[in-house]
């Protein structure tokens, strides 16, 4: 039997209660991850969020470098939840239940009482009966756990502080609710603190980074527009990424910068270091298991299989120039060139990424003239060209490769009018490309160890305390994979040797070399694609004023985050 009087004193529960006798026969042993706000550090919080992520997903489903959470269809109930046990300085403890299919909080246990958000459907209502089966009192709220409802009860997220202190207070509020010691508005705010500092931080490296900064400086502050729009857009971003064609979106997703200004995201590239986990939306098309050179085109009879769109994009490459059909003439064999990106609808810079792995402009195919290095790339009739000469793969690291030849698209010069060729892949800047409809470099600050910012200092680079809008801390991320100081976009972040410990410098972008091409990885590192080394704060000591390249080990001196 369940005692109901102490719960009904708030008028917060619904008539939807349930019995647990059947589930007590076989109690579920869900994984438990612990975190305490007592003496919490950046390191303890980072390890906690990493543990949450590792229990949420097996890593078996990874798309565009980003892990996908389990599909709820067919997921055994024994694998449906994980538990997060939180404690604070007051030695109060509560346990949150997270649904592994969306990383979201579904309920909470405090002592011998458990309470749950109102489920959206009967399936979820049945699933939560497997949680906290040994408590004496268990009830559901009359409200669900989505932000719209919680904000109606507790106020807008933009006015609710986050940080170690707010999490400490939230734990106490959740604990005392079980004894009628917490009012509903405070309870709703406390849930929003926990959800953002745990669920949203697990979903987004970006939000985890925001929380690390608050913990490091013992700061209490509300989330800015960049955080709130990411939270609101997680589902749409997950859908856009999973339904993208080789990383290009069928339609843009609008996000906001910290200052509230809006921008559109047209492709997955900038999101790889931002999103840690995606909600499952659809299964990859069966053809994605095959080489794009030989993949079959089959009807999609499975509604669960991702759409395979054919977006029309520009292809931006070296020095921010675009792939262009020379002279807007589409006769067979006309060379492809680099040219300043247009803003109109001229077809000679608009490329359709087709399901058959061709890249087409005005109905004709991007084609290699011969399968040997230094041969020109041309426009050609798709039906008369050799099939293998017209097929391309677009990798997440911004390589466009012709699978038949194993050669990659390249621009041997960064000047307008340069004719494009195929070359042996050395991951040079001259071989970096991004299919997108945003032709401008993405301007950002890059935050690293101790929440300090990467700063260009003449020909050197090191970490300094972050200063809002400081020009030396602004970086332009180019489509070709180069990272350039916003103050001087002719210079590039460069490693001029492929040796562990090499100091990274700011040098001319002219060589467009392998040492100037980088990739922001989903694990938080910035990888040099050619040598496999990552950016590293030497000895974890910013006072040395040296950023080096080093083999990956995953410590915080190798973790970087672009902030927008």
Curated annotation (Swiss-Prot):
1-alpha repeat start and end residues: 319-361
Keyword Hydrolase annotated: yes
Per-repeat ranges for 1-beta: 362-402
Annotated disulfide bonds: 282-306, 322-341, 365-382, 453-466, 492-509
Catalysed conversion reaction: Endohydrolysis of the N-glycosidic bond at one specific adenosine on the 28S rRNA
Chain sites annotated for binding AMP: 104-105, 145-147
Gene Ontology molecular function, alphabetical: carbohydrate binding; nucleotide binding; rRNA N-glycosylase activity; toxin activity
Gene3D superfamilies associated with the record: 2.80.10.50, Ricin (A subunit), domain 1, Ricin (A Subunit), domain 2
SUPFAM superfamilies: Ribosome inactivating proteins (RIP), Ricin B-like lectins
Positions of the pro-segment in this chain: 291-302
Signal peptide (from-to): 1-24
Positions that bind beta-D-galactose 1: 32-34
UniProt: beta-D-galactose 3 binding residues: 312, 437
2-alpha repeats: 450-485
Superkingdom field: Eukaryota
Residue ranges of domain Ricin B-type lectin in the record: 309-436, 439-563
Cited Pfam families: Ricin_B_lectin, RIP
SMART domains reported in the protein's UniProt record: RICIN (SM00458)
PROSITE patterns: RICIN_B_LECTIN, SHIGA_RICIN
GO biological-process terms attached to the record: defense response; negative regulation of translation
Record-listed E.C. numbers: 3.2.2.22
1-gamma repeats: 405-437
PANTHER family: PTHR33453, RIBOSOME-INACTIVATING PROTEIN
Family that this chain belongs to: In the N-terminal section; belongs to the ribosome-inactivating protein family. Type 2 RIP subfamily.
Name of the protein described by the UniProt record: Agglutinin
